[in-house]
Amino acid sequence: MRYRVPHDLLSRTFDQVRTCGAGRRECQVLWTSRWDAVADLDQLRHSRHRSYDGGLEVEDTWITEFWNELAREKRGVRVQVHTHPEDAFHSASDDTWPIVHVPGFLSLVIPQFGLGPIGLAGAYLTEIRSDGRWHEVTIEKHLEVLR
């Protein structure tokens, strides 16, 4: 599936990861959409998490609250977005602990704690396949940034 990402959503994502990470820590947001318009990403949720050297951990209680909100609002998580300090890649921890474990789920990694220009240049996108493993995919084939 190719998701449509409003430029405003991308801008708000960069604002959030820059504020949360302060150029020193990883940060995560989740892009969601309604079940009746799956391809149209329209909200971001900043997970409650603890950042540590080399990663982050999402609070268990927040995850439970978040799933309940999604159910009430008839929404789903489509893309997990997080930052890395330097180059973008998917770490072993990223592979092991995604927020969603289903084929087709996407994880987008933004380099340099999101301090670079707003956009997807230098970002890394990966997808869970039916074999349960992550595989790098082409950003342009999966995410269309709308102006």
Name what the model sees in each region:
Residues 83:
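Short, well-ordered beta-to-alpha junction loops that form the rim of enzyme active sites
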Residues 1-77, 86-147:
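Conserved beta-strand-loop surface patch within small alpha/beta domains used
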